[in-house]
């Protein structure tokens, strides 16, 4: 089996899937207490870095995605598949799991 080298540019989401770079979680509380990794909340905000071609309709056409590369999005807490590339964390999720575009 050949080794596969993954990078953001080599990940191409299929269908209505979206590849999102996860925003950094808070390192400490408002009171200044440092949080260990096990106590940090899983972030639910990130930036879209790749978008699939859209959901396939019954007639074979595609429904264009509502989000695009560069959009900052809020997504469901337990949605998608977590992927780590280097020191960065990403999540691959269905467009339906995106709750809002954040300005």
From Swiss-Prot:
SUPFAM superfamilies with a match to the protein in the record: GroES-like
One biological process term in Gene Ontology: chaperone cofactor-dependent protein refolding
InterPro entries the UniProt entry points to: Chaperonin_GroES (IPR020818), Chaperonin_GroES_sf (IPR037124), Chaprnonin_Cpn10_CS (IPR018369), GroES-like_sf (IPR011032)
Cellular-component GO terms for this entry: cytoplasm
Protein location: Cytoplasm
Family under the similarity heading: Belongs to the GroES chaperonin family.
Subunit structure: Heptamer of 7 subunits arranged in a ring. Interacts with the chaperonin GroEL.
Record's function text: Together with the chaperonin GroEL, plays an essential role in assisting protein folding. The GroEL-GroES system forms a nano-cage that allows encapsulation of the non-native substrate proteins and provides a physical environment optimized to promote and accelerate protein folding. GroES binds to the apical surface of the GroEL ring, thereby capping the opening of the GroEL channel.
Name assigned to this protein: Co-chaperonin GroES
Organism: Synechococcus sp. (strain WH7803)
Gene symbol of the encoding locus: groES
